[in-house]
Amino acid sequence: MNKKILSDAMTAAKAGLAVALTWVSIAVADNKPEELKQRILNQAQSLGPGDYAFTRTIRSEQTSNGKTEQHVNVERFDPSKSEDGGWTLVSVDGAPPSEDALASYKKESPKRRVPGYYRLAKYFGSASSVSTDSHNQTVFHFNSLPKDSAILMDSDVSSDTSADLSVAEANGTPFVENVRLTVKPMRIKFVMKLDRYESIARYRMGPEGKPILVEHISDMTGSGMGHEGKAHTVMTYSDYRPVR
């Protein structure tokens, strides 16, 4: 009898432990997205606009009222140079930039933002939902972005921009690999009607163990001042050099 009582007690204890472990596992699983989000936030906050010098090549194709123009600009960013915010226009359509092009580029320098992984810190400081894509990657979805996160044609469109951020892993370290932005149809400055804007930014893990931006592709269609148009832009980033 004593053996039976002891056996029953042990069985009950095991069952209770199994239930407890199940609840612990569920709690850990439920907490993983928040832990992952915090890790990526910390990762982005550890980086800054002055971490790297790099080259950016911009290939653009713009069509307005049936006329298409294609251009290729190459520019260089070096945070160790204070002039013009560190930006230098290297070439325009394969040739050295003209004086007018340099003057126009210099005038726009104060508006020119430094792209990079550090900018994602703003995203992860706001509310998001989580899902898993067809590649079994975790995807964070943001219905809108914090103020000053998305600038289009010198206008802040953050509140009308949704974002999907796909998380990959490199040598056991998670990082955001793809960032897809979609802007709702809207009017910009009462002049431009934006019908569609989508972009995707791709990152990879750099040799220093820090994520770096390698490509940004955007597509936009809209109309304004009696003209309809569209634009396709591909920006590639290369020649990264650590500055600090």
Identify the residue ranges that each predicted region occupies.
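Structured extracytoplasmic
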Residues: A29-T161, T173-V176, T182-L194, M220-R244
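Bacterial N-terminal signal peptides that target proteins for export
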Residues: N2-G16
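N-terminal signal peptide c-region/cleavage motif recognized by signal peptidases
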Residues: V24-S25
